[in-house]
A protein has these predicted regions:
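Beta-hairpin "wing" of winged helix-turn-helix
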Residues: 58-73
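Short beta-strand/turn micro-motifs at beta-sheet edges
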Residues: 2-6, 67-69
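Basic amphipathic alpha-helical segments that dock to polyanions
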Residues: 48-55
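Amphipathic alpha-helical dimerization/coiled-coil segments
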Residues: 85-113
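N-terminal hydrophobic signal/anchor transmembrane helix of membrane proteins
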Residues: 1-3, 92-93
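N-terminal helix-turn-helix DNA-binding core of bacterial DNA-binding proteins
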Residues: 5-47
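Exposed loop/turn and edge beta-strand positions of beta-sandwich/beta-sheet ligand-binding modules
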Residues: 76
């Protein structure tokens, strides 16, 4: 593990990438839907919520609450945004995978056979 870049789990990577793609206004339901649609991974809502909270604890995302919403029975919605450290963590994870894949059948140059 490199200093400053602890390894991300697969679910953490997916959730961070989904929040990044959704931009400001990302919340758990669209995060879950994007991961299912784009990655084919069906995470429970609970898994998404717990992962978002863990990522916030690690300093990779920040969250805030909306005003109470009538469509939610007067409850607020919790939104998430990537912090620069979250972007750095995703980049570091991608670099690590790319380095490990280099020289294997997964590498672009190796596919030309």
């Amino acid at each position: 593990v490199r200093a400053g870049h602890p390894l991300l789990g697969e679910v953490e990577q997916l959730v961070l990438l989904a929040v990044l793609r959704l931009g400001d206004g990302a919340y758990a339901v669209p995060v879950r839907e994007l991961i299912l649609r784009e990655a084919g991974v069906d995470l429970s809502r609970g898994t998404v919520y717990v992962t978002l909270e863990r990522l916030e604890g690690k300093g990779y995302v920040t969250s805030w609450f909306s005003e109470p919403l009538a469509v939610r029975g007067g409850k607020a919605r919790r939104y998430f945004r990537l912090r620069p450290s979250g972007v750095d963590a995703v980049r570091a994870a991608k670099r690590a995978v790319d380095r490990l894949a280099a020289g294997t059948v997964l590498a672009p140059a190796a596919r030309k056979a």
